[in-house]
Swiss-Prot record:
It is a peripheral membrane protein. Its EC number is 7.1.1.-. The keyword NAD applies. It comes from the Bacteria. One of its GO terms (cellular component) is plasma membrane. HAMAP family: NDH1_NuoC (MF_01357), NDH1_NuoCD_1 (MF_01359), NDH1_NuoD (MF_01358). The keyword Transport applies. This is NADH-quinone oxidoreductase subunit C/D. The gene is nuoC. Residues 1-193 are annotated as: NADH dehydrogenase I subunit C. It catalyses: a quinone + NADH + 5 H(+)(in) = a quinol + NAD(+) + 4 H(+)(out). NDH-1 is composed of 13 different subunits. Subunits NuoB, CD, E, F, and G constitute the peripheral sector of the complex. It comes from Cronobacter sakazakii (strain ATCC BAA-894). In the N-terminal section; belongs to the complex I 30 kDa subunit family.
Length: 603
């Protein structure tokens, strides 16, 4: 029975239409009804801005295949994960479920998404694997099985991915402890140490690999988890025939901190500092999707000044991250000097960020409904000095290193893939745009007032190789400088917080005049604001690709479920598909061109 839920709260009245109900009338809903019948689905009303459709488990693959072959198809599996529904109280009109799995599909041609959900009983946690339709479902299904115990039948290798192989239990279940103090004290006996070492020993047969061919044995090489070219605690096992990579297995999880589980134990406000540490180079960029998603739940419209301030800080951190990426890529190819120059330039950005926010790498400065405080005196002078400094420095990187024939020879045509492969593996950011697909969320789905800025989206010519990816990042720095110039010239006047009951913390000045305001301030700071029961979603163009938060509120001071989708996770999953048949030296250049940090992968 089609059930368009109508129990959204009264606060929907203050939300823009695109944030509330228009997704219920998305054309894809009609296409699905025409194909599968009017009674096949439950359509859920949310504040995600995305059609959310509950499908029967038996129809999942058929529906996915239908969406993949529409005239304007849903060509990317953007995200896939699960939820423990057992303690959720606000489920009016939803199918009965102990657990659920969601599939977030994206259409470039439509510039629209759809989310499919499957309800599961605790006694039958089985669902067919989506890898038959999208290869990047592999890692997502492994993580979902690991975190919830949901089995994906037909999966090629359903095993742990974030946790050690010997780990017991499923951490994102509601009955699983969230704090270390809830566990017994950890002791490492000699026997346990030997067991852990044995579990980490790579066995080719477990991954469908052969130890040799008819004439010779293959060599298996551990690259990482402490190799400098691995860019973090990242291990990749290489199957080698001489210098040629026959196959490889990326091994992640060494940096896993349980960021999504933490979201269930922190208030909506106190979780903001954790967002900075998911991708520790992005700073305020990481805070943007989270606070926007919470503001959708709350029904908050922030002042224009807040939007521009947020854009300004985000673009400063984008440049900061790109400079590190460009310089370390050059270093990976063999040139040492540029990385030291880049740290000089990045120091200027940190000085500016510190002057505005009080912190450097992890400001935790965005707030629900605004920012922590207004811009300080002299911010415009510091920004102007940086804008005068940076363009010439960027030109020097291009002239001295990126036009070097040796660097070009090492990177042009290396680790190349086309648009079809990029979409199949969930690639976003510069890696996707290098294939010729013009998709930047700041342009395609503007947020925080990006529609009011003039800037271009650098796009490649059809094939994404190492050199194209790094040169696009250079051009993105130039466009970020353009945006910053507009912030400098056109910073609006006005408040730095929204006048809304759920703005957190609320304006403190009023606490001196009204006891009710003082009580509200105390409760919101100590316990946190209570968000209406609903779901919200926000994606942004982060430094390394598309980053998003999918939040579920059950009418509490804390999130019921916090899903963090990061770009680096699918980018590393793509490595074997791209690098097979290449040399080890090509892999080093490829890793340098991806632009990832392991905290972004492992969360």
């Amino acid at each position: 029975m089609v059930n368009n839920m109508t129990d959204l709260t009264a606060q929907d009245a203050v939300l823009p239409v695109w944030q509330t109900r228009d997704h219920l009338d998305d054309p894809v809903i009609g296409e699905l009804r025409n194909r599968f019948g009017p009674d096949a689905f439950t359509v859920q009303a949310t504040r995600t801005g995305v059609p959310v459709v509950w499908v029967k488990r038996e129809q999942l693959l058929e529906v996915g295949e239908f969406l993949r072959k529409l005239p304007k198809p849903y060509v990317m599996l953007y995200d896939l994960h699960g939820m423990d529904e057992r303690l959720r109280t606000h489920r009016n009109g939803l199918p009965a479920a102990d657990f659920s799995v969601f599939y977030h599909l994206l259409s470039i041609d439509r510039n629209r998404d759809i989310m499919l959900k499957v309800a599961l009983s605790e006694n039958d946690l089985n669902v067919p694997t989506f890898t038959r339709l999208f290869p990047n479902a592999n890692w997502y299904e492994r993580e979902t099985w690991e975190m919830f115990g949901i089995t994906f039948t037909g999966h090629p290798n359903l095993r742990r991915i974030m946790m050690p192989p010997t780990w017991e239990g499923h951490p994102l279940r509601k009955d699983y402890p969230a704090r270390a103090t809830e566990f017994d004290p950890f002791t490492l006996t000699k026997q346990k140490e030997e067991l852990e070492m044995e579990a980490l020993t790579f066995k080719p047969e477990e991954w469908g690999m052969k130890r040799g061919n008819d004439t010779e044995d293959f060599m298996f090489l551990n690259l990482g988890p402490n190799h400098p070219s691995a860019h973090g605690a990242f291990r990749i096992i290489l199957q080698l025939d001489g210098e040629e990579i026959v196959d490889c297995v990326p091994d992640i999880g060494y940096h896993h901190r349980g960021a999504e589980k933490m979201g269930e134990r922190q208030s909506w406000h106190s979780y903001i500092p954790y967002t900075d540490r998911v991708e520790y180079l992005g700073g305020c960029v990481n805070e943007m999707p989270y606070v926007l998603a919470v503001e959708k739940l709350a029904g908050i419209q922030v002042p224009e000044r807040v939007e521009v301030i947020r854009v300004m800080l985000s673009e400063l951190f984008r440049i900061n991250s790109h400079l590190l990426y460009i310089s370390t890529f050059i270093q990976d190819v063999g040139a040492m000097t540029p990385v030291f120059f880049a740290f000089t330039d990045r120091q200027k950005i940190y000085d500016l960020v510190e002057a505005i926010t009080g912190f450097r790498m992890h400001p935790a400065w965005f707030r629900i409904g605004g920012v922590a405080h207004d811009l300080p005196r002299g911010w415009d002078r510091l920004l102007k000095e940086f804008l005068e400094w940076m363009p010439k420095r960027l030109d020097s990187y291009v002239k001295a290193a990126l036009k070097n024939t040796i660097l070009k020879g090492r990177s042009q045509g290396v680790a190349a893939y086309d648009a079809k492969e990029a979409l199949a593996w969930g690639t976003t950011g510069a890696g996707l745009r290098a294939t010729g697909i013009d998709f930047d969320v700041r342009k395609a789905r503007p947020y925080s007032g990006y529609q009011n800025f003039e800037f271009e989206v650098p796009v490649g010519g059809g094939i994404s190789d190492c050199y194209t990816r790094v040169m696009l990042k250079v051009e993105e720095v130039r466009q970020s400088l353009r945006i910053l110039e507009q912030c400098l010239k056109n910073m609006p006047e006005g408040p730095f917080k929204a006048d809304h009951p759920l703005t957190t913390p609320p304006p403190k000045e009023r606490t001196l005049q009204h006891i009710e305001t003082l009580i509200t301030h105390f409760l919101q700071v100590s316990w946190g604001p209570v968000m209406p029961a609903n779901e919200s979603f926000q994606m942004i163009e982060a430094t390394k690709g598309i980053n998003s938060y999918y939040l579920t509120s059950d009418g509490s001071t804390m999130s019921y479920r916090t899903r963090v989708r990061t770009p680096s996770f699918p980018h590393l999953q793509q490595i074997p598909s791209v690098i097979r048949g290449s040399l080890v030296s090509d892999l080093i250049v490829y890793l340098g061109s991806i632009d990832f940090v392991m905290s972004d992968v492992d969360r």
